[in-house]
């Protein structure tokens, strides 16, 4: 009864109006699952391949018909007849069918869409929530959210090199309250920006993209918004995080961090050592709890120095650095580079590999942050993954745009469903930092 009888993919649009995949999996019992695939703007060079058509006459070359055809004509034939509950076997079969190290033949977007849809169909068959199916009876931790309220870098037209300025309600008693805190700060920030005559249009992830005078102006403005909303900045209230996305402004030939790419003439150009110094200055000055991709994805020496200097005080998250890949994570653990991994399901391409990366991180004392992409959909699977794995943290955008809010609303539902079992750890989510 739980045998897969049909797999079907179609092309749909993501939050940027670009094509992506939606996959449906059907079983003998009538149980059904649907998965949608996100897409990134700033992507690591080691990520699994997102298959695009390249036909400039259609969707500017970004069409996904090849990936759709791969699902409907190749993957479907291979997995029809499998028990939908056998997630690992299905994921392994798709990996073998692709046969490349980066899923470049069938496309990670094709494989991931099927992987998500299979899990959802299995949960439907068993008549349990997705987070329960994925995580079992020990599922209980609601993630502390990283809320991206100011967008810079490749996510907006704002003249700021750092891609994301985030707030984290680490002092909130519950996820529901933490979400309220974040929303109130978001609205306080909007009011402050208006009073300064700055634009309040939002970027890809729902954060504002104003023309600040630089990084510190952005941080100072967020601190004012926290205060205006009636909260305190720090461990008992709200703390700040960055996604530097440093690979986006790292000049490989000159081996420098060239802030002029986003901030224009007169902006800083820093060596690897100077980049570490700069980040340390910011940490010393402001209530910063997390920094993502503070160094370029290939600047291993820089990462090791940054970790030595700040790794006990601040969460140092590898995104482009690790690309949700256990091979890169294992090297980072061995060489003491970073202390946290960002988990993006489409960077690696299957739920099985995603869970393996989270497990490896936890075993090494690294934290794991489950994350969206800048090109999102209404699919809320990552909310269930965050709770299923007790990851403790989620990064899913600002407090606007339905593609972001869909994940927050799903977490509110999960917290309600878990009832008294639900835990929100806040500052304790950073279990590898010494306070």
UniProtKB/Swiss-Prot annotation:
Gene assigned in the entry: eno
Cross-referenced SMART domains: Enolase_C, Enolase_N
Native organism taxonomy: Bacteria, Bacillati, Bacillota, Bacilli, Lactobacillales
Subcellular location: Cytoplasm; Secreted; Cell surface
Function field: Catalyzes the reversible conversion of 2-phosphoglycerate (2-PG) into phosphoenolpyruvate (PEP). It is essential for the degradation of carbohydrates via glycolysis. 'Moonlights' as a plasminogen receptor and plasmin activator. Binds host (human) plasminogen in vitro; enhances the activity of host tissue-specific plasminogen activator (tPA).
GO molecular function, one term: phosphopyruvate hydratase activity
Gene Ontology CC, one term: phosphopyruvate hydratase complex
Free-text cofactor note: Binds a second Mg(2+) ion via substrate during catalysis.
Binding site residues for substrate: 155, 164, 292, 319, 344, 371-374, 395
Identification of the protein by name: Enolase
Domain of life: Bacteria
Enzyme class: lyase
Organism: Streptococcus pyogenes serotype M1
